[in-house]
Amino acid sequence: MEKQILAAGGIIIDESSDSRRVLLVHRPQYDDWTFPKGKLDRGETVEEAAVREVREETGLKCRIIRKLAEARYLSRKRHKGPLIPKVVHYFLMERSSRRIKVPGDEVDLALWVDLNEASQKLTYAQDKKLLDLL
């Protein structure tokens, strides 16, 4: 039995327009809006996983600026079974590519949202708390 689920994700800020925007993704399986994130692959660091997950879910090449926070909550593996502690390591990132390309299965939409409006769009309280760190 797994003791905890380890995951990592990225919070990408765009400051190229008049307002600061953050990138959110929609996952049809959960019908939620969140930050790009996912579980670590075997042998992968949290930093490597965060960069990989952002690229897989958004198509963006990004680099880590700094670690932002760890979010801890209970989750089910694949919607079934007992609740397991989950730890998500979040990193502030900047993009080195501009074209967003979502895979369509895990993520079907990626949207730049004004930082002041992101809390209204985000589904989970633990994600909304991360906005205070930006």
Q: How would you name each of these model-derived features?
A:
Residues 34, 85, 112:
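Short aromatic/basic micro-patch
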Residues 3-5, 32, 110-111:
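A residue-level structural signature of the nucleotidyltransferase/glycosyltransferase Rossmann-like core
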Residues 59-98:
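Active-site segment of metal-dependent pyrophosphate-handling enzymes
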Residues 18-61:
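Conserved Nudix-box catalytic region and its N-terminal flanking loop in Nudix hydrolases
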Residues 1-21:
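Conserved N-terminal beta-strand and adjoining loop/helix that marks the start
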Residues 12-14, 26, 94-95:
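Residue-level signal for short segments within beta-strands and strand-turn junctions
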Residues 90, 94, 99-132:
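NUDIX/MutT-family hydrolases
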